[in-house]
Amino acid sequence: MNYKYLIIGGGMAAHSAIGGIRGIDNEGSIGMFTGETDPPYDRPHLSKGLWTKGESLNDIWRDMNSDSVDLHLRTLITSIDITNKSVIDDIGKTYTYEKLLVATGGTPRRLPFGSDHIIYFRTAEDYRTLRTLTDTQQRFLVIGGGFIGSEIASSLRQNGKEVIMVFPENGVGANIYPNDLSNFMNEYFADNGV
């Protein structure tokens, strides 16, 4: 199958690219490939609004129908041939393109050991898993003090859970914010039981 625009990834950058494409080309075929099981959604809600604002998963899905996008869920692109303008997916199917965007986003670092109770929080499926754990567990360890780690810690705490945060930096958001703000956040989290 050939696409005028082939996008690898299903996050916010990919969705924004589709909006930009449709702003200049209403007819060109678009194929979006993502390894996720869910259609594109607003990722920030996973660590905030779904926990504290009474939102549901139905509130976060992005409308893909109006943009005429062929959405390939649970599909990983394993090879890119820039010379021949083609990609191969994880079952060996080849797709060609005129323009390619790789917008896969980042993935959390993995620990050198595993457990069913370790969640590398990034996807709607990760949200579902963590939400299910909150039904049976009271104590949570959040590794990471950046945006997602601090949002998850805050959301869990606001839902009455005991939360411990661990991070290699000197404070919450230390790699993101000025020292004064990071120090304030440390105090704020500690004052609120984290």
What are the residue ranges of the model-derived segments?
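FAD-binding core/adjacent interface of flavoenzyme oxidoreductases
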Residues: 1-6, 62, 66-141
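Beta1-alpha1 glycine-rich phosphate/pyrophosphate-binding loop at the start
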Residues: 2-70, 155-180
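Glycine-rich Rossmann-fold phosphate-binding loop(s) that bind the pyrophosphate
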Residues: 9-12, 122, 144-146
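N-terminal Rossmann-fold NAD(P) dinucleotide-binding loop
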Residues: 14, 149-150
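Helical element adjacent to the flavin cofactor pocket in flavoenzyme catalytic cores
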Residues: 61-71, 185-194
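Amphipathic alpha-helical segments in well-structured domains
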Residues: 127, 181-182
